[in-house]
Amino acid sequence: MYRKVQMENALPVVVIGAGPQGLAAAAHLVERRMPVIVLEAGASPAAAVAEWGHVRLFSEWPELIDAAAARLLCATGWQAPTAGYPTGEQWIETYLAPLAAALGDRIRLGARVTGVSRLGRDRLVDAGRGDQPFTVHVAPTEGEEYRLQARAVIDASGTWATPNPAGADGLPALGESAAADLLSYRIPDFRDRAGFAGTHTVVIGSGHSAVTAVLALARMARRDPSTTVTWVLRRATAGNTFGGGDADELPARGALGKTAKEYVDAGLVSLVTGFRVERVTRAGESAVLVAEDGRTLTADRVVVLTGFRPDLSFLSELRLELDPTLQAPVRIAAEIDPNVHSCGSVAATGAADLAQPEPDFYLVGAKSYGRAPTFLALTGYE
């Protein structure tokens, strides 16, 4: 017990990821005067957000700012925006970058976490396990691998680095890897029209990212009829793909769905349902998607937006209790199931809900939702 008290007094809490949730967690720890180190794999804070910086969020400013972070920032003279729907770039510039600056050298950039365990204890060992600090193995962009000791670990690394493939069975379709140069797994920045104008693009997916991409391409097609767009859904019918419209809990999201339906009805977008990709082949500079039922689609570009999944590989030596379907903490799985809930109907969760059998280890943010696409920044802050 004496050793554990010493450890808690001396060692920092390590937060993995300097995205919105990781920075917010750090702000709460600073407010409680607890030492904290934030490890960010990217070259800048909020590196994942920067990759979709051109995309506009459907949450308003007040829902995108954590309370403890705001208190930390207000001490510097910062003023919180009160209305509007920012892009990812605006979120960084106005809030996330100033928050990272306020946290200062507590953040280490270019620090990729490759493993988390207990000092001198692998996953099997019970004896004295809870009395040992965590060991966090770090592979920096420059220099040799090192490890840190921590009193607690908060994994806020998100899911951005592990997108789902085009294959309908959750695995890459046959030939998908070989055709990787013709496929992208993020929402492209359509402000650069060069790669899409005058081409045929297939978008695979039914979520909000897919809707956002389809809308951008449809607007391009409206200006340039030589641009064609096909929207592929795995499900047999469109169902709730277009969202709740005026009844949507998130008005901006509802508006996206309404516009998407209008574009489909107007013929700017060709909607294909029940298309489950089994194989991807090349035909010159084009990709040919082959469905399980034998149908084919030929495209100049394929944008795969089928969701994300958590990277659990570096947590293999920890004792986790995750839902077998969602790969989320079991206590919250029923509340975030996308078959039942949408983003706006998910209740806030607390530390007790996110705790794991490994004491003092927590999954937070988008990663705590596993494969469920219903996470909102506001829910994470709460």
What residues fall within each predicted segment?
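Feature captures the FAD/FMN-dependent oxidoreductase FAD-binding
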Residues: Q79-A152, A156-A161, E278-V288, R301
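A Rossmann-like FAD-binding core segment of flavoenzymes
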Residues: A111, G115, R219-S316, L320-D323
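N-terminal Rossmann-like FAD-binding beta1-loop-alpha1 element of flavoenzymes
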Residues: L11-V38, A210-M220
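Glycine-rich dinucleotide-binding loop and its adjacent helix/turn
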Residues: G88, D155-R223, V229, L326-E335, ...
